[in-house]
From Swiss-Prot:
Key words of the record: Gluconeogenesis, Glycolysis, Isomerase
Protein name per UniProt: 2,3-bisphosphoglycerate-dependent phosphoglycerate mutase
Family: Belongs to the phosphoglycerate mutase family. BPG-dependent PGAM subfamily.
NCBIfam families with a match to the protein in the record: pgm_1 (TIGR01258), PRK14115.1 (NF010713), PRK14118.1 (NF010716)
Underlying gene: gpmA
GO biological process: gluconeogenesis; glycolytic process
């Protein structure tokens, strides 16, 4: 069995080196090109999908659409879920990473970005950009909508969707594409690869590059590689 992850193509805020999180930004021109190249590469290598899963953020949805279009599979059903959203970076969202490091120190920013269980400064619920004010999340209980997350909390958010939707799809024989975000994919990778809390800090997933997992019947990883 195979599973394909793809992190969205470069976003406009990736290009500007800003913390993004749940803020909804578009793909950059480079990001659009990365998504198109990924779709063509998947087609060239014979990858076909029966179902695709993505987040409710534009950059991931757009990447999913482009990948499927460029691989002549735009008909493939897509399921969008907030559970595959990027990690919520709290009050860091919209800030320049370099300037934030100059203010708080490189080590503190590294911990905020990469540690497994350290939360960023939380966003106020009445902030203009709070997810509590976004109709995408209006159906969710208020205590479920995050104001900031670490990777541990992100995994706790993503894991129920893996267990309820993605894993059963794979086990039923469906060929699955997951188009999501750096940290939601890192969280899933931690789970399926059994990566330790310490080692996950070093895992980077590049934008717009298909990551293929070969899995056994128990969804244990046999092999993984980038196309």
């Amino acid at each position: 069995m195979e599973l394909v992850f793809i992190r969205h193509g470069q976003s406009e805020w990736n290009a500007k080196n800003l913390f993004t999180g749940w803020r909804d930004v578009k793909l950059s021109e480079q990001g659009l090109a990365e998504a198109a190249a990924a779709g063509k590469k998947l087609k060239e290598n014979g990858y076909e999908f029966d179902i695709a899963f993505t987040s409710v953020l534009t950059r991931a949805i757009k990447t999913c659409n482009i990948v499927l279009e460029e691989s002549d599979q735009l008909f493939v059903p897509q399921i969008k879920t907030w559970r595959l959203n990027e990690r919520h970076y709290g009050r860091l969202q919209g800030l320049d990473k370099k300037q934030t490091a100059e203010k708080y120190g490189d080590e503190q920013v590294r911990i905020w970005r990469r540690s497994y269980d350290t939360l960023p400064p939380l966003l106020d619920k009445d902030d203009a950009f709070s997810a509590h004010k976004d109709r995408r999340y209006a159906h969710l209980p208020a205590d479920v909508v995050p104001d900031g997350e670490n990777l541990k909390v992100t995994l706790e958010r993503v894991l129920p969707f893996w267990e309820d939707q993605i894993a059963p799809a794979i086990l039923s024989g469906k060929r699955v594409l997951v188009a999501a975000h750096g940290n939601s994919l890192r969280a899933l990778a931690k789970h399926i690869e059994g990566i330790s809390d310490e080692d996950i800090m070093g895992l980077e997933i590049p934008t717009g590059q298909p990551l293929v997992y070969k899995l056994d019947d128990n969804l244990k990883v046999i092999e993984k590689f980038y196309l």
